[in-house]
Amino acid sequence: CFNNRENGLTKVLGVNASPNTIDELLSAEVILCAGFVAKENQVIRLKLKQAAANGAKVILVNPEGYEQDHMSFAYKTISTSNSLAFFKGVAKVLVDMGKGAGVEGYDAFKASVENADVCEEIKAVAELYANAKKAMIVFQQNVVSVEAATLLADIAVLSGHIGKARDGILELKAKNNSQGIIDLGITAGAEAMEGVKALLVFGEDVPADALKELVFLMVCDTHMTETAKMADVVIPGTGFASTYGTYTNTERRLQVVEQAIEEDVVFNNWEVAAELAHVYEIEMPYDDIEDISDEMNEKLPVYRYGEMGEVSGGVLECKDAKLVAVEDAALIAPLKCTDHLTNMIDERLPKAN
């Protein structure tokens, strides 16, 4: 998936998912937001606004020139350089407070932030966050860099604000079913294209440079995208409104999708893959979506015991958490969305003032 990015949380917490859930924000005392773009996350912005109304101190940290709009309810908005300097300073303050001394990797991490600069503002934020009874960190996975996500997880582990209700991290995934893709074991991003000579693309408008080494390209999509124009074969696909099944959203909640539109296509998207497998004498014994769901339930415990509308796994305890030192890097490194329908809808939606 071209919209996949390595998850910095995995290095520290051992999980490739958001440990906490959205409504936990409403009962937190302090919420630290890093690289948060309000206009791209209106639902979360409203939750943050509700949390502030409930008494939470919402702190927004974005690089200079980056969006600070639509967050007037925030307790503090901070403009910093597009680097990890601010959060390395926060980590140093936590270390100096004696936090996290018993955690695996502590000595190497302590050495990595020993020379971090600490100003009064950094010290105040670190102490406010560390001393809260319940504190959350919020960030967008495909907006902050991998190193930034790793450092934010380090900060949560150092402070002890991890693995408990209303005490942890809310990692916002790029799309409505990004977590579902990860649960199926699909974690590779554009780096998986190295050496690939033939490609089947579902719904993504891929940068042309990523396709130049291909000898065969097949596209299944709802529109004649730029990628489809380059393809050797194009098959009409079905959009989200013409499918049914489930999504697993950013907080690991299972959500039912009901078909709203009947599209005049020969194959549904999953049937395209099944028919291609049949050509290569690989049988996929599915008659319908229910058969696929049954196999997922059999092979994936997280879905076997999942209930529709519920969060799979509850709050993740992250018992194997450790500290991981990070090199200097950007705080913000947005990954461009290649989902054609998502981009088309985003272009046509009215923009907030």
Report the location of each language-model feature:
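Non-catalytic alpha/beta scaffold blocks inside enzyme catalytic domains
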Residues: 2-307, 353
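Long, low-complexity segments enriched in small/aliphatic residues
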Residues: 148-153, 292-353
